[in-house]
Amino acid sequence: MRADARKNYDLLIEVARDVFVEQGAEASLRDIARRAGVGMGTLYRHFPNRDSLLEAVLRSRFAALTARAESLLLAADPAAALLEWLAESVAFTHQHRGIIAPLMSAIDDPESALHSACVALRAAGTSLLTRAQQAGLARPDLSGEELFDLIAALAWLREQPS
């Protein structure tokens, strides 16, 4: 990638991250391009659709949550590690309003731009859950899919009007 193209790509990611946090996942792509100081053509050259932009924005955060889960696998208390990761995951969903519907549909859609990021996030939580279950500190009948659904449900509740 040319240096100027890379600069625009990185700038679009940075601006989109802020706009998605401020306005939610359905924020205007035109607003993102305007705030980044680029044209719509530049945005679409890098990101052909909203899902690809959202996936790029979320990729770094998912990687951080995955890395956090991996580091928590070494924690002395598997239940506390699982709860800490769960709290961080829920906090992330609260920062990014409107991502739950796309995430829940992407987890089952291998064609979605968000699919691989969702699968990695669920696998990270499943590893922590399995460790807590093996220590007898979590219900043995709870699955990684149900844990992912719990995160989604908590985020969905947060998005509902009071």
Regions found by a protein language model. Name each.
Residues M1-R34, S52-E55:
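Basic, helix-initiating cap at the start of DNA-binding domains
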Residues N8, R61, L65, L86-S89, ...:
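Hydrophobic/aromatic residues within well-ordered alpha-helical segments
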Residues L11, A80-E88, A120, E146-L150:
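Amphipathic alpha-helical interaction segments
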Residues G24-A25, R45, R139:
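Helix-turn-helix/winged-helix DNA-binding modules
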Residues A56, A67-Q95, D109-A113:
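Hydrophobic alpha-helical connector segments
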Residues A63, P102, D109-A152, E159-Q160:
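Amphipathic alpha-helical packing segments from all-alpha helical-bundle domains
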Residues T93-M104, A155, E159-S162:
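Short amphipathic alpha-helical interaction/hinge segments
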